[in-house]
From Swiss-Prot:
EC number assigned by the record: 6.3.4.16, 6.3.5.5
Family per similarity comment: Belongs to the CarB family.
Domain MGS-like: 951-1096
SMART domains noted in UniProt: CPSase_L_D3, MGS
Main EC class the enzyme belongs to: ligase
Pfam families linked: CPSase_L_D2, CPSase_L_D3, MGS
Binding residue positions for Mg(2+) 2: 299, 301
Originating species: Paenarthrobacter aurescens (strain TC1)
Keyword set includes Magnesium: yes
Binding site for Mn(2+) 4: 839, 841
Protein name, per record: Carbamoyl phosphate synthase large chain
Functional pathway: Amino-acid biosynthesis; L-arginine biosynthesis; carbamoyl phosphate from bicarbonate: step 1/1; Pyrimidine metabolism; UMP biosynthesis via de novo pathway; (S)-dihydroorotate from bicarbonate: step 1/3
Location of the region described as Oligomerization domain in the Swiss-Prot/TrEMBL record: 403-546
Domain remark in the UniProt entry: The large subunit is composed of 2 ATP-grasp domains that are involved in binding the 2 ATP molecules needed for carbamoyl phosphate synthesis. The N-terminal ATP-grasp domain (referred to as the carboxyphosphate synthetic component) catalyzes the ATP-dependent phosphorylation of hydrogencarbonate to carboxyphosphate and the subsequent nucleophilic attack by ammonia to form a carbamate intermediate.
């Protein structure tokens, strides 16, 4: 049955900012969906607040709204655009919850809009835990014994029936937010309290513990004619109790008997029918008791999920694309499989390889957080690898994480450590895989470890096999052909083999290649080689037959950014995808190398060829060799994927690989303190006084010379890893003592810290002769807060023309002095009217997508072409990629104002005592994602950015103010304006006195440190938790008040009210609150903004 003809326009709801539990996979699904809708001739409207996504590029939709995803805002878009239908299944939990709210508020009925891809009844059945329990029973399957509760009293009553431990799961939340395991009454009180708060329906499910059972997922699709396919089975390496997003997962499931698999399949098909998902995909999670074989259905997601992205990349079956076609009325047998072009989508994929996904964590960013893994997801990214067997895929996946200590360690284990390792492995943490493998290496048995961890014995045997292989490599001592072939089949890297045989990596590689032991590249074809594959999507294996086809033109290789992490996220993937698009359009063959299953760059049709490989020197050199053998390589781009490929630049150049764009020498010059200082001197530019220390004595001397406070950090880092502002010698000695390795190769850099400076960020293009300045961003928070966590505004709102001219001149001088070809990002600070250069990065930065969206100029595409020799003049002329005149520093006065705001994951991380980690910002980056607010003026744009970052500003109510002495004078005007608007101001001791002296009514309240009064009057933290305060404004002072402030900020984070910690942000918030009270909120698409901007620029040039 062909597609429906009654739909003319569709509104797609995106997933908003990247947060833990809802990441780049929804940009990948959303981008596919938009493509399908456009191909089918529909008018496409999109709402998504995240500017770092490919889907918000204006060419993917007819009207792109970068606006907060709230029911109120989406209603305004519906009223303006009048779509026929809404597709809410591709934007994660955010989109589903918004669609449900629009249905409940009567908005869908009012504007006669239909939901496609899922109906409300199916969403409710799948997401509402009580209803879903009924579904499972009607299908003749079991779910865990459970109680649904809405209050604390009900929770304690349920505990008597279920007994401890029990699982707590709130309804309608995502990534396990608010869930946990309660081992006793205190846990129950804490976790249920959070859960009731995070659940939009204040409903929580308590269920019997099935800890230690085996966990599986099936990824399904169903069409309206009741055709059902199982796309992929996924098995969790970790047993139940660890969120599937934090577990190592394997596809296809490896430890199920055929009979068990058929049972799961039958139950899944019954459930998907009963729930009524009839135009799309869903995933269903199961648990199996290893002792009795009892099967329990855990939950279902009636939408495209994180697992669907993994299943798509693992099988080559484009779930999101097919789900979108189903929502338009097609059936599975009418949709062709892109890869084979012969089979329809109703053919279930078969795999002749193993896929392993490994999570990447960021606990080093939150030293106070507890690294136990629970049902609340905590990982920030993931890497995926494919191999012909489990050991090969596992070792490749671990190598793809790029974390110190992520690969297995085969050095000998003393006997006395074994018992301790087994004991530690009982508690699931980020190190559990290594503890298990080391315990086995030290002589523990598979039975011992199964007893301790409940990890399936088959997986434990595989780890044992790796240990045995490592022992054989060590025993051999010499690099023989047989030993190397065997080691490679189990995924050992040259580096690991070198460590076991006391050779360095280069020697192993030389011998291996001389013996002709090279990987071959296999193709992901969805059908175990039954049909030919038309899309070259490859993975390496030490097998027999190579499947890389010949290519007529030399290829351009783009190195991706690897797994998402804090400091290197989707923004870098955006630049890689743009480069590939621009180069393909210009007629080049592009090759993408990456190992992140969530991203658009690893979609099989973004580049001419895709290699799903780790980004290590060994793996990248082998891909280059394969491309050389089959048609030659023009060069490699390392400047687009962040720090990951940049680190390989010099080694690749040493191996004779041509680097496109900025040279490795120029990259090194910008990172090297001394050489960069010479560039600044020659240009007459200043940087804050600084020095390089290799010991505490050095550091003390430098700090005394330049004066405290100082900013200390290791060299070569991204995301401010390990940075700190140090105010005195005692803290300096503590920092140096904790810094892992300080050597002459890895010195510590010490800079004068500029207090009260305005930070400025610039992205520019340089081709050797001309410069194009993409945009000048003014940071809202003061210098000292990491640029990735700071809100910023473009065009700048307080910088005069003279400052902008100085920034321009400095940018050009640095780009020329460093020798950039392509993108460069420079951070400046303006203090007492002196312009300081903080740092320069000769690569795509994390602000490139924001600048591109705010100004309508696609910077990464331009940079890729400059790398192949195109000039800025040509880009302004024949290529029409840059404006003919002017640039991002000369935007007219009526250009729209865009505000970028960071989104922080504090509510996910708790200390071992169960408290939220501190939300105070500093020089180390902690945000996982970003949003953009764009409007005619700064105040409304800032208000939009806060609403989009889930921090909507209040327009009435109570505001708590408590600031450090140094800030008291600067906040009086702002507080007075709020008081005049009718807000009640609540304050502690000192601040309250100052406000009263200035004629501002302030209600005094007790500090956290004072505790409750004898009359039972609570502290400010108690008031916040009781929901009596609508916004907290607290700037930290040194010492004791820091802990006072921490309790308060933790309370605000845990109940989700805005918590402002800098004066600059407070002043911006006051402007925004005034605007919210006076102006009607209007929605404008990026396409409309672009038209307004070009009209304004033409008028300015006329």
């Amino acid at each position: 049955m062909p597609k429906r003809t009654d739909l003319k326009s569709v509104l797609v709801i995106g997933s908003g900012p990247i947060v833990i539990g809802q990441a780049a996979e929804f940009d990948y699904s959303g981008t596919q969906a938009l493509r399908v809708l456009k191909e089918e001739g529909l008018r496409v409207i999109l709402v998504n607040s995240n500017p770092a996504t490919i889907m918000t590029d204006p060419e993917f939709a007819d009207a792109t709204y970068v606006e907060p995803i709230t029911p109120e805002v989406v209603e305004k878009i519906i009223a303006k655009e009048r779509p026929d239908a809404i597709l809410p299944t591709l934007g994660g939990q955010t989109a589903l919850n918004t669609a449900i709210a629009l249905d409940k508020n009567g908005v869908l009925e009012k504007y006669n809009v239909e939901l496609i891809g899922a109906n409300i009844a199916a969403i409710e059945l799948g997401e509402d835990r009580e209803k879903f329990k009924g579904v499972v029973e009607r299908c003749g399957a079991e779910s865990a014994r459970s109680h649904i509760i809405h209050t604390m009293e009900e929770a304690f009553a349920a505990a008597e029936d279920l007994g401890y431990p029990m699982v707590v799961r709130p309804s309608f939340t995502m990534g396990g937010l608010g869930s946990g395991l309660a081992y006793n009454e205190d846990d129950l009180r804490r976790i249920v309290g959070q859960g009731l708060q995070y659940s939009p329906t204040t409903e929580v499910l308590l269920e019997e513990s099935i800890l230690g059972w085996k966990e599986y997922e099936l990824e399904m699709m169903r069409d309206k004619n009741d055709n059902v396919v199982v796309v992929c089975s996924i098995e969790n390496f970790d047993p139940v109790g660890v969120h599937t997003g934090d577990s190592i997962t394997v596809a296809p499931a490896l430890t199920l008997t055929d009979r068990e698999y058929q049972k799961l399949r039958d139950v899944s098909i019954a459930v998907i029918r009963e729930v009524g998902v009839d135009t799309g995909g869903c995933n269903i999670q199961f648990a199996i008791d290893p002792a009795t074989g009892r099967v329990v259905v855990i939950e279902m997601n009636p939408r495209v999920s994180r697992s669907s992205a993994l299943a798509s990349k693992a099988t080559g079956f484009a779930i999101a694309k097919i789900a979108t076609k189903l929502s338009l009325g097609y059936t599975l047998d009418e949709i062709p499989n892109d890869i084979t072009q012969k089979t329809p989508a109703s053919f279930e994929p078969t795999l002749d390889y193993v896929v392993v996904k490994v999570p990447r964590f960021a606990f080093e960013k939150f030293p106070a957080a507890d690294n136990t893994l629970t049902t609340t997801m905590k990982s920030v990214g993931e890497a995926m690898a494919m191999g012909r067997n489990f050991t090969e895929a596992l070792q490749k996946a671990l190598r793809s994480l790029e974390q110190k200590g992520s690969q297995l360690d085969f050095s000998s284990v003393p006997e006395y450590e074994v018992a301790e390792l087994i004991e530690k492995a009982k508690r699931p943490t980020t190190d559990r895989l290594h503890q298990v493998q080391r315990a086995l290496l030290g002589g523990a048995t598979v039975e011992d470890l199964f007893e301790a961890t409940k990890i399936d014995p088959w997986f434990l045997d595989q780890l044992q096999l790796l240990n045995e292989t490592a022992q054989e490599i060590r025993k051999a001592g010499v690099l023989t052909e047989e030993m190397l072939r065997n080691a490679k089949r189990h995924g050992f890297s040259d580096e690991q083999i070198g460590a076991l045989t006391h050779n360095n990596e280069a020697v192993v590689r030389g011998v291996r290649q001389a013996l002709g032991i090279r990987p071959v590249y296999k193709t992901v074809d969805t059908c175990a080689a039954e049909f030919a594959a038309y899309t070259p999507y490859h993975y390496s294996s030490y097998d027999e037959e190579d499947e890389v086809g010949l290519h007529a033109k030399p290829s351009v290789i783009i190195l991706g950014s690897g797994p998402n992490r804090i400091g290197q996220g989707i923004e870098f993937d955006y630049s890689c995808v743009h480069a590939s698009m621009a180069l393909r359009k210009a007629g080049y063959e592009t090759v993408m190398v990456n190992c992140n299953p969530e991203t658009v760059s690893t979609d099989y049709d973004v580049s001419t060829r895709l290699y799903f490989e780790p980004l290590t020197l060994e793996d990248v050199l082998e891909v280059i060799a394969a491309e050389e053998r089959t048609g030659g390589v023009m060069g490699v781009f390392v400047q687009l994927g962040g720090q990951t490929p940049l680190k390989l630049a010099q080694q690749l150049a040493d191996a004779g690989v041509p680097i496109l764009g900025t040279s490795p020498e120029a990259i090194d010059l910008a990172e090297h303190r001394g050489a960069f200082a010479r560039v600044l001197d020659e240009a007459g530019l200043t940087s804050p006084k600084n020095g390089t220390a290799v010991s505490f004595e050095d550091a003390k001397k430098i700090a005394d010379e330049i004066g405290y406070p100082v900013l200390v950090r290791p060299s070569y880092v991204l995301g401010g890893r390990g940075m700190e502002i140090v105010y005195d010698e005692a803290n300096l000695s503590r920092y140096i003592a904790n810094a892992t390795e300080i050597t002459p190769d890895h010195p510590v850099l010490i800079d004068r810290f500029l207090e009260d400076a305005v930070e400025i960020d610039v992205d520019a293009l340089f081709d050797g002769t001309d410069m194009y300045l993409g945009g000048i961003m003014e940071h809202i928070e003061e210098a000292g807060i990491h640029s990735g966590d700071s809100a910023c505004v473009l065009p700048p709102i307080t910088l005069g023309n003279n400052v902008i001219e100085r920034v321009r001149t400095a940018t050009r001088a640095i780009a020329e002095g460093v020798g950039v070809r392509g993108l460069i990002n420079i951070q400046f600070a303006l203090a007492s009217d002196v312009l300081y250069v903080l740092e320069a990065n000769p690569r795509a930065s994390r602000t490139v997508p924001f600048v591109s969206k705010a100004t309508g100029v696609q910077m990464a595409k331009a940079a890729a072409l400059i790398g192949t020799g195109v000039t800025i003049n040509q880009l302004r002329g024949a290529y029409k990629m840059l404006p003919e005149t002017g640039d991002g520093s000369t935007l007219p006065l009526d250009a729209p104002v865009a505000v970028k705001e960071a989104v922080l994951p504090f509510s996910r991380f708790r200390t071992p005592e169960g408290k939220v980690v501190d939300s105070l910002l500093g020089p180390e980056m902690r945000s996982t994602g970003e949003v953009m607010g764009i409007d005619k003026h700064f105040d409304t744009a800032f208000a939009k950015s806060q609403a989009a970052a889930n921090n909507a500003l209040p327009t009435e109510g109570k505001i708590f103010v408590s600031v450090a002495n140094r800030d008291k004078r600067s906040v009086i005007m702002g507080v007075k304006r709020l008081s005049d608007l009718g807000f009640e101001i609540v304050s502690t001791g000192g601040t309250a006195d100052v406000l009263r002296r200035n004629g501002i009514q302030a209600t005094p309240v007790r500090k956290v440190a004072e505790g409750s009064s004898a009359e039972g009057e609570g502290t400010i933290a108690d008031l916040v938790i009781a929901g009596e305060i609508d916004m907290v404004f607290n700037t930290p002072s040194g010492g004791e008040a820091r802990s006072d402030g921490y309790e308060l900020r933790a309370a605000a984070t845990s109940i989700g009210i805005p918590c402002i910690t800098t004066v600059a942000e407070f002043n911006a918030a006051v402007q925004a609150i005034e605007a919210l009270r006076t102006y009607e909120w209007s929605v404008t698409s990026l396409q409309e903004h672009a038209a307004n901007l070009s009209a304004a620029m033409e008028a300015a040039n006329a």
